[in-house]
Amino acid sequence: MGPVRILVVDDFEAWRRSIVSIIADDPELQVIHEASDGVEAVQMCQELQPDLVVLDVGLPKLSGLEAARQIRIVSPDSKILFLSVIPSQYVMREALRIGAAGYITKEDALRDLLPAVRAAVADREFLSFTILPEPQSDLPEE
């Protein structure tokens, strides 16, 4: 089996470069393409059928969550790993409901990206430790 073929999707070029740089450290992983918005991500998944998509939540044209829903249709064997600046349990739960293999925060990317990629490839879920708890609605108002 060859290297794991990865599509990296983030609207900020600096983040894409960082993600690609981290992935390049592992000879068993290969970035096959980069995309900067949700529409391009879906198109590239349909065309390239990557093994794994590292997908930002906050994307232009089509949100990461909506792109993931469409990727599940056009490239059903592609695993999806969300990478987000948003440490939200709600967004994380929605990502997992869609079928994501994991959800990591950009804050933790240096530490968590490669372990999360390896977990996704092995069909294991991976979540960042810094996902914030949801606000409690039953707290007394001041």
Label each region the model flagged.
Residues 28-36, 44:
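Short hydrophobic/Thr-rich beta-strand motif most characteristic of the beta2 strand and flanking loop
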Residues 48-54, 59:
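Active-site beta3 strand of CheY-like receiver
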Residues 90-97, 102-142:
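Short, flexible helix-to-coil linker/hinge segments that flank and couple to helix-turn-helix
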